[in-house]
Amino acid sequence: MDRGGIILSLDAKEFISKFETFCPLWLAEEGDPCGLHLGTLDKKIERVMMTLDVRPEVVKEAIDKNIDLIIAKHPPIFRPVSRLTADDPQTKMYIDLLKHDIAVYAAHTNMDIIWDGLNDWFCEMLGVNVDNYLVKTHEISFKKLAVYVPIEDSRKMRQALADTGAGMQGNYRNTSYSLVGTGRFTPNAQANPAIGRSDQEEKVQEARIEVVFPETIQEKVLQAMFAVHPYEEPAYDILPLDNPGESFGLGRIGHLDTAVDIEDFVQKVKTTFQLDGLRLVQPKKAKQKVQNIAICGGSAGKFYPEAIKSCADVYITGDVNYHTAHDMQS
């Protein structure tokens, strides 16, 4: 099975940093072990494999194809491992991965929750226009960073901040504002200035760069700012914002352009996801025409009350247990 090997050449940390800008770890639900599971990111990578689960056959394929990094939907290690032995198929996978220097990174519920993530892809495949999330999980407040930097360093600073995920506002990325002015300072005898001399006033043409960022990445934003700023003591402000925050949630609520027969929609789901069969749980008074759709990947049967509240005609999920199915029919 071809699991979508990608050939590239770049630093693994840089690759994951860019990935987490799109799909941040702070969106993962509590207790969900997302992130790096095995190996190291202190290396160059050329081949990346995407997979749903890390299983022995996946590991063998990764070894055969000289894969450097596996990005998995489901974390391979959910519980602490007490011993690593080759006679256990599960732990032998870990041994083989480490032996062949294959890193494993998991993006689980954060990939389910992020806008333009997995549930949005499902909706796009089925022709569902997304209106909202199904179950709210996060409400994120924003802050603003204003940093003063010599004009010749402003482009480098804007890029470094954008790489952390700062400047993301709705459907727009890399947003910032710059204002040019004059910075004044006098280094003392103990200073080691990048510009100017001790005990002499210095004037520098500087840009004030402003970016908005979610409060969850403040430390990352500041680390990036300090890393590229040429000054020994950068001047900057962090401002709290009273603007409405951004909400995130599991699942999606949406609608089809036109209502369709339930049988036709079921067939479309089977065809789209290449299913041999699926389970249809249908109340006696269910609508025969459907248009409002709720969807949540994975085992999300417990969220069917939210689907009902959203006035969905159909709720699609990966797994529904026996008793929940009976509740749905009642």
Where are these regions (language model features)?
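Hydrophobic structural segments
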Residues: 2-330
